[in-house]
C-alpha cells in the first residue's frame, strides 16, 4: 500500500516537478550546445519573477486590482472572484528590460521589433484588464476593439520584419527541409501573432494552465532555435529560455489555488511574444506543434461557436459539441478536478514539445 502511494506521488506533475524537469533539461542543453548561458538565464529570470511577484502581489492588493468573474462561466469559479490580477506585469516587465539590455550591447532590428511588438500587446492587455476592473465586469475592451488593435500592430510588425529580411516565403521544417509558401507566408504570420495571442488568452482559465504551458512552450521554442545552429539566432533562443523562467517563476503564485492571475496583461503578451520569436527565427512549423494545447483551446471555441450557429440555422435551435468552451471548462463540467486538468494538459504539452524537437532533428 505504501509502495503504491509512493508510485502515485512520483507520477504527479506539479509546480516543483515541472521546475526540476525544465531545469534538468536546460542543464543538459547547456552541455549539448556548449553554452552555460542557457541554464543561467533561465534561473536568473525565474528568481527575478519570484522576487518581484512576491513583493508586487502586496502592491496589487493595496491598489485593489482584483479579478471579476463572468456570469456565464462555471459556477464553481465564483470563489475565484477578487483574486489579485494583472500579474502578467511581473512576467513582461523583466522581458522588456532584458530586450533593452540586449539591444544596448547587441544592436539588432529584430530585437527592436520584438521589444515594441511585445510592449504593444502588453499595453492592449493592460488596458483590457484595467477597464475590466474599473467597470467591475469581466469585460474590458470589446472583442472588436482588441482585434483591430492586435491586427494593426501585427500588420506593422510583419511589414517591418519583411522589409528587414526576417520574413521570406520558405518555412523551415528541419535543417534539411523547407516549404515554399509564396505569399501565403503573410497570412501565416498574421494568424501566428493574432491567433496565438488570443489562444493563450483563452487558455488562461484555470489556475496555472497558461503559465505552466507557457513555460513548456518557451522551453521548446528555445531548444528548437539552438538546434538550428545559426549563431545570429542564439540570442532569441536565450530570450525564449528567459521567458520560460519567468513563466515558471510566476507559476509559483499562479498554481492552484492561485494567489494571483496574469490577466490579459500577461496572456496576450505571452502569446504574441511566442509568435514574434517564431517569425524572427522561422520556427513556425515547430511552434505549431509545441503550442498544440493553445491551438486546441482556440479550436474548441471556433468549433463550438460554428456548430451552434450552423445547427441554429438548420434546426432553429443551436446545439453544442462541448459542455462549455474553451475545452478545459468542458472537462471541469464533466467532473474532473481543476488541478488534474491542468496536470494532464501540462503532460500533453511536454509530449508535444518532445514530438516537435524529434521532428526537427529527424525530418
UniProtKB/Swiss-Prot annotation:
Biological process, per Gene Ontology: cell division; cell wall organization; peptidoglycan biosynthetic process; regulation of cell shape
Listed Pfam families: Glycos_transf_4, MraY_sig1
Protein origin, superkingdom: Bacteria
Named cofactor requirement(s): Mg(2+)
Membrane topology classification: Multi-pass membrane protein
Keywords linked to the UniProt accession: Cell cycle, Cell division, Cell inner membrane, Cell membrane, Cell shape, Cell wall biogenesis/degradation, Magnesium, Membrane, Metal-binding, Peptidoglycan synthesis, Transferase, Transmembrane, Transmembrane helix
A GO term, aspect molecular function: UDP-N-acetylmuramoyl-L-alanyl-D-glutamyl-meso-2,6-diaminopimelyl-D-alanyl-D-alanine:undecaprenyl-phosphate transferase activity
The protein's annotated pathway: Cell wall biogenesis; peptidoglycan biosynthesis
InterPro entries for the chain: Glycosyl_transferase_4, PNAcMuramoyl-5peptid_Trfase, PNAcMuramoyl-5peptid_Trfase_CS
Gene Ontology, cellular component aspect: plasma membrane
Enzyme class: transferase
Subcellular location: Cell inner membrane
Reaction equation(s) it catalyzes: UDP-N-acetyl-alpha-D-muramoyl-L-alanyl-gamma-D-glutamyl-meso-2,6-diaminopimeloyl-D-alanyl-D-alanine + di-trans,octa-cis-undecaprenyl phosphate = di-trans,octa-cis-undecaprenyl diphospho-N-acetyl-alpha-D-muramoyl-L-alanyl-D-glutamyl-meso-2,6-diaminopimeloyl-D-alanyl-D-alanine + UMP
EC number, UniProt record: 2.7.8.13
Annotated TM spans: 15-33, 82-102, 106-126, 147-167, 183-203, 207-227, 233-253, 260-280, 285-305, 341-361
Function: Catalyzes the initial step of the lipid cycle reactions in the biosynthesis of the cell wall peptidoglycan: transfers peptidoglycan precursor phospho-MurNAc-pentapeptide from UDP-MurNAc-pentapeptide onto the lipid carrier undecaprenyl phosphate, yielding undecaprenyl-pyrophosphoryl-MurNAc-pentapeptide, known as lipid I.
NCBIfam families listed in its UniProt record: mraY
Listed HAMAP family: MraY
Family the entry assigns: Belongs to the glycosyltransferase 4 family. MraY subfamily.
Official protein name in the record: Phospho-N-acetylmuramoyl-pentapeptide-transferase
Annotated organism of origin: Prochlorococcus marinus (strain MIT 9515)
Phylogenetic classification of the source organism: Bacteria, Bacillati, Cyanobacteriota, Cyanophyceae, Synechococcales
Gene: mraY
